[in-house]
A protein has these predicted regions:
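Alpha/beta-hydrolase superfamily serine-hydrolase fold, recognizing
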Residues: 1-217
């Protein structure tokens, strides 16, 4: 497996780029080591962290797992607090569109791009899937040409309600209206376990996930 390729989501000079270069919205693309002429499915991964950080154990390990099994694993480094709504949503939508735009470069089938999210990243993935056009960023020049809607969705212990809790405050800020909280709620075990390799009752879930993805036609 090759080392990841870093792709910045927004061009130099964009107001979406924080001052700290380590916080610049970007994707890390992990490709399978074996080359193939056949386009492959891709999974865009949104790590959790309560919209205040991004948990490392919910990003790179899964991208490498997917790449080791012939898929393209992509970690999405989206903006978090104090960058409130719509910043994370704009980054996730941009990431989906960017993957489809760069599909020939990375050997991706643009019709088989999944999104995966953990905890707050699960909320971001769920929102991208159910409300891909919730916020149309005026700086996203890819929006007229590429869809942000994923072809499959993988939610691992996701946050689905924005009606209470710090996760909502970190996304929307302290002055958000009830209407905004409801709009960000997608709902009508164990948390933060990542691959759960040390939990016998859960450790098989990554294998089941790979089996499910291997049959993606």
């Amino acid at each position: 497996m090759t080392e990841p390729v870093i792709v910045n989501l927004w061009p130099d000079g964009s107001t979406h780029n924080p001052v700290d270069p380590n916080e610049r919205p970007r994707i890390e693309v992990y490709q399978p080591a074996a080359s193939s002429a056949m386009p492959k499915p891709a999974v865009v991964i949104c790590p959790g962290g309560g919209y205040v950080g991004r948990a490392p154990h919910e990003g790179e390990p899964f991208a490498r797992l997917f790449a080791a099994h012939g898929l393209v694993g992509i970690v999405c480094h989206y903006r978090v607090s104090p960058h409130y709504f719509p910043a994370p949503m704009a980054d996730a939508a941009r990431a989906m569109r960017m993957v489809r735009r760069l599909a020939p470069r990375f050997g991706v089938d643009p019709g088989r791009v999944a999104i995966m999210g953990f905890s707050a990243g699960g909320h971001l993935a769920c929102t991208t899937a159910t409300q891909p056009d919730l916020y149309c960023d005026p700086q996203d020049d890819l929006a007229p040409h590429y869809s942000a809607r994923p072809d499959r969705v993988i939610l691992a212990y996701p946050v689905v309600s924005m009606l209470e809790g710090l996760c909502a405050e970190n996304l929307l800020g302290k002055g958000a209206s009830q209407e905004q909280w409801r709009q960000m709620s997608n709902e009508s075990g164990p948390h933060g376990v990542g691959m759960a390799a040390d939990l016998p009752r859960l450790a098989s879930w990554t294998g089941l996930l790979l089996t499910w993805l291997s049959g993606w036609e």
